[in-house]
Amino acid sequence: MLNYTGLENKNVLVVGLAKSGYEAAKLLSKLGANVTVNDGKDLSQDAHAKDLESMGISVVSGSHPLTLLDNNPIIVKNPGIPYTVSIIDEAVKRGLKILTEVELSYLISEAPIIAVTGTNGKTTVTSLIGDMFKKSRLTGRLSGNIGYVASKVAQEVKPTDYLVTELSSFQLLGIEKYKPHIAIITNIYSAHLDYHENLENYQNAKKQIYKNQTEEDYLICNYHQRQVIESEELKAKTLYFSTQQEVDGIYIKDGFIVYKGVRIINTEDLVLPGEHNLENILAAVLACILAGVPIKAIIDSLTTFSGIEHRLQYVGTNRTNKYYNDSKATNTLATQFALNSFNQPIIWLCGGLDRGNEFDELIPYMENVRAMVVFGQTKAKFAKLGNSQGKSVIEANNVEDAVDKVQDIIEPNDVVLLSPACASWDQYSTFEERGEKFIERFRAHLPSY
């Protein structure tokens, strides 16, 4: 809906280029705004900056001159830029309007929105909703924090489509009129306190997701965190999910996902592993039911969706052994979730960059670990950990070598789990590269027929 006129002839300052700033600047120019882009980095050789300049958009880089505020612009801020940055801090003092580009996506599109936020699980929930839409004849376009710039996708959707948008707390701080038809808060734990300063500020940022909702909209949230999530501002119809008890919404009972007393699917038929993922699944299923996605499409998705790449991703089965790639587990909390996701014996591949951490906090989660294959800078620490718990420990040179060594010790029905609990930078440039090496090596060991 590029006939939106609310920004025509307005001065707008886009602070922070990156993908979202680039797309926001182009959109604002189409909407008739007088656009300036500012970035603290030198953009003199940046291709996107040159592209914007060719459109007549001013680009000021290398610093944040406060004179850019003299024409009282509306600020469109990159969500990763904290409010303590000089130009943003000064804009706040002057009372200037500060938005993020997801607000633009709402202003220009008539498509209903499913918005997903939370400390953990939001990417999985967003992706699963997208997969359920894909299995149906309906269209749900992914956008936001999941990697697709919301204001760009919003220009491409029809009013009959859904925008399925993942939102971080940073993005939610910059909304004014943004109103999802269906909002999901997966959970709220302590996080990003370096940005928000305290837990209360972080919680309030998450609650922004429902501040503009009305009685015709829906909020989906964790029943067991309802006191943290709900507030007097909440006007939407609230529905809950729970893996522990019957609730007004969706829940697990007798091993089935149940909605309004109707069994949808046996949890044993789900491909995505882990108790934490059960909550993610419940939230996604409920959102899709409310959006009109057929139950058959939902079931088709649940029996095939194996997760996000590198996040407890089901890679495949070799004979009776399932392999899981959790390379994104770069800290002990993520690995705790992974180890807690299986009842079968686990061969655990772990190790990586040594940041001076000890790993004793993983001991309570090692009950099902039968053997460990350790690698990287921390392999001695993990070997010590495994030996202290009476586990079989094998040392490997890297992830590829670890998968090779697994073949010597694997037994029927073992789960092979790469969950390093460490960053990858001692041996790999990214956790994605580490995960890809794991997958490649798994495939190399598949029997050829």
UniProtKB/Swiss-Prot annotation:
Alphabetically ordered keywords of this record: ATP-binding, Cell cycle, Cell division, Cell shape, Cell wall biogenesis/degradation, Cytoplasm, Ligase, Nucleotide-binding, Peptidoglycan synthesis
Pfam family, one: Mur_ligase_C
Keyword set includes Plastid: no
Entry similarity comment: Belongs to the MurCDEF family.
Reactions mediated catalytically: UDP-N-acetyl-alpha-D-muramoyl-L-alanine + D-glutamate + ATP = UDP-N-acetyl-alpha-D-muramoyl-L-alanyl-D-glutamate + ADP + phosphate + H(+)
Influence of pH: Optimum pH is 8.4-9.6.
GO terms assigned for molecular function: ATP binding; UDP-N-acetylmuramoylalanine-D-glutamate ligase activity
Chief location category: cytoplasm
Gene Ontology CC annotations of this record: cytoplasm
Function comment: Cell wall formation. Catalyzes the addition of glutamate to the nucleotide precursor UDP-N-acetylmuramoyl-L-alanine (UMA).
Pathway: Cell wall biogenesis; peptidoglycan biosynthesis
Superkingdom: Bacteria
Cellular localisation: Cytoplasm
Residues that coordinate or bind ATP: G118, T119, N120, G121, K122, T123, T124
PANTHER family per the UniProt record, alphabetical: UDP-N-ACETYLMURAMOYLALANINE--D-GLUTAMATE LIGASE
InterPro entries: Mur-like_cat_sf (IPR036565), Mur_ligase_C (IPR004101), Mur_ligase_C_dom_sf (IPR036615), Mur_ligase_cen (IPR013221), MurD (IPR005762)
Entry annotated with the keyword Cell cycle: yes
Top EC group: ligase
EC number assigned by the record: 6.3.2.9
Protein name: UDP-N-acetylmuramoylalanine--D-glutamate ligase
BP GO annotations: cell division; cell wall organization; peptidoglycan biosynthetic process; regulation of cell shape
